Design a protein with these regions (language model features):
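Aromatic/hydrophobic pocket-lining residues that form π-stacking "cages" and hydrophobic walls in ligand
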Residues: 2, 62, 104, 135, ...
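Extracytoplasmic "Venus flytrap"
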Residues: 1-3, 25-32, 54-57, 120-129, ...
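Beta-alpha junction/loop-to-helix N-cap segments that form part of ligand/metal-binding clefts
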Residues: 12-84, 152-159
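Periplasmic-binding protein-like
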Residues: 41-54, 74-76, 116-121, 170-180, ...
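Hydrophobic alpha-helical
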Residues: 56-67, 157-158, 164, 171-191
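Signal peptide-proximal N-terminal region
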Residues: 1-22, 140-145
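An alpha-beta-alpha
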Residues: 90-154, 173
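Surface-exposed amphipathic alpha-helices with a cationic face
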Residues: 10, 42, 63-67, 109, ...
Length: 191
């Protein structure tokens, strides 16, 4: 999409006669790589603006570099709280979990009759921790009881112990703020 847009803009004469040049780095969803990519793009490549990173964890680590350099950074799916409070050069186009989760919980309560839930979240990631914190507040506001709270770390593959505890707690549902790799395994093992 970016390349198509740049090609179209450049074919029409660019921006004020200047051609757009895209410089692409892959931060691989890792904080350290995001920091390295931002430093390279800002200080070596001298880019005027950054798009990304996609993950809140990477954004929280790398966006302060852009802010300090007064380089605009635009995150495309940074939903964790606190990202845009890094500074006035940090933007995002996605709503926060604090905005989404209360509506999601209210809908689940109304349509599914959920009265008590178990929570299984990744405790070593900004996105999943923020999701947990916001989910907890939304549950309290809807008066939904939490039967048990279990945690996992990014990269875990065996969730049997947590799922056994969740099952014995008698919840109506399970909330899993997490990424697809762990969430898919949790769903598979929960069956």
């Amino acid at each position: 999409g970016f390349q198509l847009a740049a090609d179209e803009i450049n074919a029409a004469g660019g921006v004020n006669g200047n051609k757009l040049v895209l410089v692409i780095e892959d931060e691989q969803g890792k904080k350290e790589e995001a920091i390295n990519a931002f430093k390279k793009l800002i200080f070596q490549d001298k880019v005027l603006m950054l798009f990304g990173p996609t993950l809140s964890n990477s954004a929280q680590a790398a966006d302060p570099i852009a802010q300090a350099a007064k380089t605009v950074v635009f995150g495309t799916s940074n939903t964790a709280d606190g990202i845009t409070s890094i500074g006035d050069h940090v933007f995002r186009n996605s709503v926060t979990e604090a905005d989404v989760l209360p509506v999601t919980i209210a809908t689940a309560v109304k349509k599914l009759g959920i009265k008590k839930v178990a929570v299984l979240y990744g405790n070593d990631d900004v996105f999943t921790k923020s999701g947990y914190d916001n989910f907890k507040k939304a549950l309290e506001a809807q008066k939904v009881a939490v039967t048990t709270t279990e945690t996992f770390a990014k990269g875990d593959v065996d969730f049997k112990a947590q799922l056994t505890a969740i099952k014995s707690a008698g919840a109506d549902g399970v909330f899993v703020p997490g990424y697809y790799a762990e969430a898919a395994l949790i769903c598979k093992q929960a069956r």
